[in-house]
Amino acid sequence: GAGGGDARHDGAVLIALNSSWDAAALGLHTVFQNNAEWIVETVRHLLASTAANVIVRQHPAERLPIGATTDDYGALLRRHFGDEPRLHFIAAADSINSYALLARVALVVTYTSTIGIEAAALGKPVVSPSNAYYTGLGFVWKADDLAGYQALLEAGAAGQLQVTPPMREDAHLCYYLTQCCNWF
């Protein structure tokens, strides 16, 4: 069965990628020009400015033929960071359960992935630099510029962002409305 990772993931920062082909992710960049820049600059800042381990989790749907992408995030990270011991890439096909992983990490960073809603509903702080449909609803920390984004990353990695019960309730409501009621 799929596991939840290992001790390197305890207290780590999880960068949860959305599906590259997801139309919900198009045109929402506010801080970065594209996904590759967002991923690389987020990892770079976390490694340089925090002591946290960093996990980059490719969207699990990309393991399926219908959801596959030509984007090679593992190669992108190796090209920029080599064999950095604090960086762990989890490919779509890797046998790690994203929800078990959520239980271990201290902070979740998303662009548009639904796991941002789920993480907040579970009480995990979420930081996003995008205009995703849920980032303005009050249960994630949204950044509109690079300095604000980097400050939120540092605060989240240091455990300074706390999800309140009303934030969790709003995330549950958002999940229900967008993931349960919106399917036909």
Can you say where each PLM-predicted feature lies in the sequence?
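Short, well-ordered coil/turn elements that cap or connect secondary structure elements
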Residues: 49-51, 82-84, 121
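Generic recognition of stable, solvent-exposed alpha-helical segments in well-folded globular domains
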Residues: 34-41, 68, 72, 96-104, ...
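Flexible loop/turn segments at secondary-structure boundaries
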Residues: 21-25, 61-66, 96-99, 116-118, ...
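A donor-sugar binding/catalytic signature common to diverse glycosyltransferases
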Residues: 94-141
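Nucleotide-activated donor-binding/catalytic signature segment of Leloir-type glycosyltransferases, i.e.
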Residues: 73-92
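Leloir-type glycosyltransferase catalytic cores
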Residues: 1, 139-184
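Conserved catalytic-core segment of nucleotide-activated headgroup transferases in glycan assembly
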Residues: 1-78
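Generic beta-strand/beta-sheet core signal
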Residues: 16-18, 57-61, 90-92, 110-112, ...
